[in-house]
Structures are given as structure tokens and as C-alpha cells.
């Protein structure tokens, strides 16, 4: 099975180490453009752009990078309760049209009550999912060209419609991640691809089975994806050393403050991430080659696959065998790690690459000329 491999735009900061400004770099437009263009050239199918008050706005970032990329798709956030579903549908169609069909959408209900209150959303966990279901029903129908009247508990629209259709028909695909039962119910009814954070394979298999069963009960099929960091090197020893370096500047106080902040979240997925390490930097390998060190101070995706290319590829295959066809990867720093993943991992997995433009001569990668007149060949050919 060919796998869709996405990269990540770190609009909330980037650097060589977690939890410190040492080794950090400015995430300005020029740097984001570097990462996006690298992902585009290396064969990643798309990039996830995060959302929230700690991030730059995902829609504006995507719009700014469309003109400087060729094939890369942009997975941007839909925020139910913060914007009207009809307005969001118009924005989605516009982004899809401006990008000539390179827009993808990620439904984000939110998990931080403090941040949501600051954005004017004062709904509890269950109410947010109720509102998200209503939002998505309207958004989908409007994008598909219907005139929509909807009288819901949280959202009411009358005569909602779209004049300029999206390029992708009947509409761009919708992605969504959530671990609660309410989230799984929403995924089963509304989305094309259900995302999970990188839990051990057995836990991921259980979630996939639950969503698949719920979708089948509604006569639907859902695809599956996973969000993971990757630390891949020439050898396993080098990869684990890189993992240790990534958290080498973290002290216990920083970890404790981060975990206290994340504890206020009502996100079930965030709670499951925190349970993998318990705020303790000992025994962070929670499953073979699955390392929970990132989650000591980072909200959201908190695990990384660690190893050499063949080892990480074997773990990717384990998840793929569960039914996952889309992998959203990242690594610190994101520019350099995009190259490492492409060069050390892509060799060992079946990557569904975007169509490449035709090139002539030696524009395709061939290495440096040997002794001025000898074309280098692959080690596998010798």
C-alpha cells in the first residue's frame, strides 16, 4: 500500500532543543517558506499547519505559501464555534480555488477551556462536539453546492449557499482527530480521514476498530492517519543519542510546569498522551522505538519514532498494517529533519509521491560527479 506522507509547519516555534531558547530560530515567513519548499521538492504530499493562540494563523500561512510551492497540499484548521460554517465553507472554496485543488481541512474542536473562553467559546466538552457535528453538516452541504436551512441546538442558518465551488469535487476532504467517544461518533458520521496521535500500536488498533465499526453502522468507510514525530539517523545509536539531546536542556521544573498547564485540558487525547510518560523522563520508550520525550513539554502529538531508516520503516509498516494510510511527521528542527526523513526513511517505505514536473538532463538527483567525468551509481546497484 502506498502511503501518504505529510510534513509539518512549526508556526509555534522551532529549534534544536525542547524547552529552551538555546538553539532556537526565528520562525518567520522566510523560514516557513524554506520548509514548505523543501517538503514540496522532497516528495511530501502535504503539510499540516497547527492552530491555536500559540500559532500563527493557519489560513494566512497557507495562503502565503501557495504561490511558492507547486504540488504541496496544505492541511488547515476548521474551528467550529469560532467561525460560521457558511463563512468557513466560502473560505475553504476560495483556498481550494487559489491553490488549484491543494487545500485540505482539519476539523479542530479544541481542548483548552481557557483558550476557547478567550476566543469567545464557552461550551463544555460534550457541547463542543454537538456544535462541531452541526457545523460540519452545514459546511459539507454548502461546499457540495446545496442550499441549506438548518435549525440546530447550537447553530441556525437559513438559505446558506456557495456561489464559487471548490476545485476538488464534491468538496475537499475533511480530516479530524479525537479520542473521546463523542469524537469517534463525529468521525464516523462526517469525515473522510480520522487522525490519531502516536500511541502504541495496540491502542491505535483499538481506536481504529471502534471508528470503523461506528462508520460501518452508518454505511460509511473512513480512512485513517497518524501524527508522529520522527528521529531517524544512519544508525539506531545515533537516533537515540539525538532523542536524548532533544530533551537535554529540560529540567524538572520546566517539565512540571508544562504538565500542570496541560492538565487543565479537557481533551481525552491529551490525557492519553500524558499518561504515556506521567511527567517522568525515565522509561520514555513506551513501545518499541516509540519515544514519549516530546510530550514532556509539548501539547498535542507527544511521541516520536526513533531509529535508523529500516527500523523506523518497520514501525511505520506496523501502523500501516492496522489500516493507516496517512502519516503526518515532524522533527526538530523541521527544515533539517525534513531532509533526513526523506533521505533515510523514504527508501524503505512505499511513498505516494505527488506528480513531479518533467525535467531534463541531470536535474534529477544523482550526487556529485566522481573524478569529474564518472556518474555515481547507487550502492544497491554494485
From Swiss-Prot:
Gene Ontology BP annotations: alkanesulfonate catabolic process
Keyword Repeat: no
Recorded GO MF terms: alkanesulfonate monooxygenase activity
Keywords: Flavoprotein, FMN, Monooxygenase, Oxidoreductase
Highest rank taxon of the organism: Bacteria
Gene3D superfamilies for the chain: Luciferase-like domain (3.20.20.30)
Record flagged with keyword Ribonucleoprotein: no
Listed result of changing residue 253 to E: In strain: Blue1
Coiled coil regions, renumbered to chain: none
Pfam families assigned: Bac_luciferase (PF00296)
Disulfide bridge partners, by residue number: none
The enzyme's E.C. designation: 1.14.14.5
Catalyzed chemical reaction(s): an alkanesulfonate + FMNH2 + O2 = an aldehyde + FMN + sulfite + H2O + 2 H(+)
Database matches in InterPro entries: Alkanesulphonate_mOase_FMN-dep, Luciferase-like_dom, Luciferase-like_sf, SsuD_RutA_monooxygenase
Family, similarity comment: Belongs to the SsuD family.
HAMAP family reported in the protein's UniProt record: Alkanesulf_monooxygen
Role of this protein: Catalyzes the desulfonation of aliphatic sulfonates.
Name of the protein: Alkanesulfonate monooxygenase
Organism of this sequence: Pseudomonas sp
Amino acid at each position: 500500500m502506498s502511503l501518504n506522507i505529510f510534513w509539518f509547519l512549526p508556526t509555534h516555534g522551532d529549534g534544536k532543543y525542547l524547552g529552551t531558547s538555546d538553539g532556537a530560530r526565528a520562525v518567520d515567513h522566510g523560514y516557513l517558506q524554506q520548509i514548505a519548499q523543501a517538503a514540496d521538492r522532497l516528495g511530501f504530499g502535504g503539510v499540516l499547519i497547527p492552530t491555536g493562540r500559540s500559532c500563527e494563523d493557519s489560513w494566512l500561512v497557507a495562503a502565503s505559501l501557495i504561490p511558492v510551492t507547486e504540488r504541496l497540499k496544505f492541511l488547515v484548521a476548521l474551528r467550529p464555534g469560532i467561525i460560521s460554517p457558511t463563512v468557513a465553507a466560502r473560505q475553504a472554496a476560495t483556498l481550494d480555488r487559489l491553490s488549484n485543488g491543494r487545500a485540505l481541512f482539519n476539523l479542530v474542536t479544541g481542548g483548552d477551556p481557557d483558550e476557547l473562553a478567550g476566543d469567545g467559546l464557552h461550551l463544555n466538552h460534550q457541547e463542543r462536539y454537538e456544535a462541531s457535528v452541526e457545523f460540519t453538516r452545514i459546511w459539507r452541504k454548502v461546499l457540495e453546492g446545496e442550499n441549506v436551512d438548518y435549525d440546530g441546538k447550537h447553530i441556525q442558518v437559513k438559505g446558506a449557499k456557495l456561489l464559487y465551488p471548490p476545485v476538488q469535487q464534491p468538496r475537499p476532504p475533511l480530516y479530524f482527530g479525537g479520542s473521546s467517544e463523542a469524537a469517534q461518533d463525529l468521525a464516523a458520521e462526517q469525515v473522510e480521514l480520522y487522525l490519531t496521535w502516536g500511541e502504541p500500536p495496540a491502542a491505535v488498533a483499538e481506536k481504529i476498530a471502534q471508528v470503523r465499526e461506528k462508520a460501518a453502522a452508518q454505511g460509511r468507510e473512513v480512512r485513517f492517519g497518524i501524527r508522529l514525530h520522527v528521529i531517524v539517523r544512519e544508525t539506531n545509536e545515533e537516533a537515540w543519542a539525538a532523542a536524548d539531546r532533544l530533551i537535554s536542556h529540560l529540567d524538572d521544573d520546566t517539565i512540571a510546569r508544562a504538565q500542570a498547564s496541560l492538565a487543565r485540558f479537557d481533551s481525552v487525547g491529551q490525557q492519553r498522551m500524558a499518561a504515556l510518560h506521567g511527567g517522568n523522563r525515565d522509561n520514555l520508550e513506551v513501545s518499541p522505538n516509540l519515544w514519549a520525550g516530546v510530550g514532556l513539554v509539548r501539547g498535542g502529538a507527544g511521541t516520536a519514532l526513533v531509529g535508523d531508516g529500516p527500523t523506523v520503516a518497520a514501525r511505520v509498516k506496523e501502523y500501516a498494517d492496522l489500516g493507516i494510510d496517512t502519516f503526518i511527521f515532524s522533527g526538530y528542527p523541521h527544515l533539517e529533519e525534513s531532509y533526513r526523513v526523506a533521505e533515510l526513511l523514504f527508501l524503505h517505505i512505499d511513498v505516494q509521491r505527488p506528480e513531479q514536473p518533467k525535467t531534463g538532463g541531470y536535474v534529477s538527483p544523482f550526487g556529485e560527479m566522481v573524478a569529474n567525468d564518472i556518474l555515481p551509481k547507487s550502492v544497491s546497484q554494485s
